[in-house]
Amino acid sequence: MNLHMPQDEESEAELKNLAAVPYQMISPANNASIIGVFQDSLLGAYRFTRPDIKFDRREAMNLLMSFNKIDTSVIKKKKEITSFDIMSQIMPPITMKFGNKWFADSGEEYNTSNNVIEISNGKYIRGQMEKGVFGGGGNGLLQRICNYYGNMASADFVDNLQNIVTEYMKTSAYSVGISDLIANKETNEKI
């Protein structure tokens, strides 16, 4: 990674406006998102959006601890908060409904399948996240948030999603490959 040190005010302004990550989320070449959700965050989002994931109030607040716009009325009303309720907290007021990549092969009913992502005015109703939901060329969730609500809203959504699923994965069991556990030569030298 390169470090750019602006030497004058013009260079500083150029970096703030041209090199800022939120303004580089969508590729001008093909109008598709180039920054997205990958690896641990993608696995976490996939596991987090399964239909029967529930939390008590304390667990829900722990997941939302780094989010600064919590709608506490949703959390106060229910004894069990679903992962969809938590996703609704970070979702901008977008409305969309589309099948994920598994829907075509599932043979399930469109109106009831968890392989259909349904969001209504920012309320996450159903659907299991997967790579195509976030990317998907010009039709992905990040692309739509960026188009309708701007670059900063899209960057905030990615940040909030990553914070929530990282906290979720800390308390949710999952397996890793052996290659994830083997330290490289540089790390071994540091140890």
Which residue stretches match the model-derived regions?
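Feature marking long nucleic-acid-engaging regions of large polymerase/nuclease enzymes
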Residues: 1-191
